[in-house]
Amino acid sequence: MALNNSHDVRKRIKYTINITIYMQGGAFMSSTVKEIKEKTGYLKRSDLYTIGVGQAIGSGVLTLIGPAILLTGQSAWLAYVAACIWGFMMIAPIPWITSTLKLGGGFYSLVGDMAGKRVAGMYAVGFLPQTINLATYGVAIGMYANSLWPQINAKWFGIAALSVFFAINLCGVDVMAKVQKILVILLFVALGLFIVLGCLQLKNPVFEFTAPDFFSNGPSGFFSAIMLYVYSTNGYSCIMNYGKQAKEAHKDIPKALLYCIPTLMVVYGGVAIVASGVLPLDQVAGQPLTLVAKNILNPALFTVFMIGGPVLALSSSINSTISNNCIPVAQSCKDGWLPKSWAAQNRRGAYWKLMTFTYLMGILPVLLDFSISDVVNNIMLLASALAFLQIYAYFQLPKKHAEAWEKSPMHISNGKYYFLCCLSLFAYICIFINSCRSLKLPVVIISLIAIVVCMAYGWFRSVSPDVKMETSVWED
């Protein structure tokens, strides 16, 4: 069977691609914020690992494999493994950066330290729209709950889920991390059950590379499948946000990052093997994973899988996304790019105002039935612009922090490090070009205007006496 890779196929999966990519007031015056002594050095390597894996494994593992089979046939599993490698290429320098520096505000702190004040301002305001990614999870978790229990209203279930994890995150990062560990363990059990029972029922030649259906649409189809998958493969980079909270940041953060890569390759590859190996390809192509799950699991196990698979995958993503969105923004508030009062903390150290903002950004599109795919489309180029700022910052490490770089426990030669930076640049350029092919002219115009606004903001705001860049990057 040859699977069609026509324009219609690409159109069918466009919405899925957009959703997966981001599964993501007042006068600006100086104000006094009550200082809360932050708890530091309490996250273990296992905590960081589960935060990263839980963030990365979202709805993509359930929704993307069917469309990928349309694009590349039996090799959909291999494309997912390749996408995990591509996803690492996008952030390849980060393990080495985090072995050298502790970052208090994630990418914002890195860009501000390496690229300068004005670029930090551009990044600060450009990051805010990306908090819309929480809404994509709210929509998805409601959809899956409704498919399992039709009597449940998908919209209100999504809002309820966002509300529960908003409350958990208000209890502090330590509580969020404990909940995340439980969610990820249960998620592994559910996906492991699917993989093991599915592999026992394989019928298709999933490992015959020369089979006609293995690369059904040739190299272009295989590459398209990688691009479809790739945004579900590097969410674990959020671990870098927790430099202050990690017990041994220089050792634990880079290792936790690296541990996530083989984990995702095994989980994603295993699920995709089962998805393409049990039923005929023409039955599963373009279909969600639940179709296969119903065929290999009895009703009781299917219910367990639906709760432990898609629902918990999205729950772990929601749980970590709230804090991940707040930490960089909080640092930009402390530096004066945004109102400093926004960085207020409760007694548990949670940035409650920013979490409320993130929560509202998550529930309002769900509540008002906004087209999230349209919103995501309109900020796609802005997100790409921020990614290129990150890459510029990567290249500055050996010069900006030469002594700390030499002492890094993961030190490599400058040539090898710059090679990793070039890999990241190459990976992002390919994704940027691939994304631009699907963008319409109005979206491009809106995105370019947004980029210009961010640049202008960084330039003019940088001269304000209220902007005082705090130290949020430490060498020891």
What residues fall within each predicted segment?
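Membrane-interface "cap" regions at the ends of multi-pass membrane proteins
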Residues: 15-75, 87-88, 92, 104, ...
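Helix-loop-helix junctions that connect adjacent transmembrane segments
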Residues: 35-40, 77, 150-153, 182-303
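Select transmembrane alpha-helical segments in multipass membrane proteins
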Residues: 41-52, 116-128, 161, 216-229, ...
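Transmembrane alpha-helical segments of multi-pass small-molecule transport proteins
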Residues: 47, 81-82, 123, 148-175, ...
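Hydrophobic transmembrane alpha-helices that form the core helical bundles
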Residues: 67-70, 89-170, 310-331, 371-386
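TM-loop-TM module centered on a large, flexible mid-protein loop between adjacent transmembrane helices
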Residues: 106-116, 258-319, 338-375, 379
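Membrane-interface loop-to-helix entry segments
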Residues: 142-145, 154-204, 216-217, 234, ...
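C-terminal membrane-solvent junction of multi-pass transporters and transport-like membrane proteins
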Residues: 341-352, 387-441, 467-476
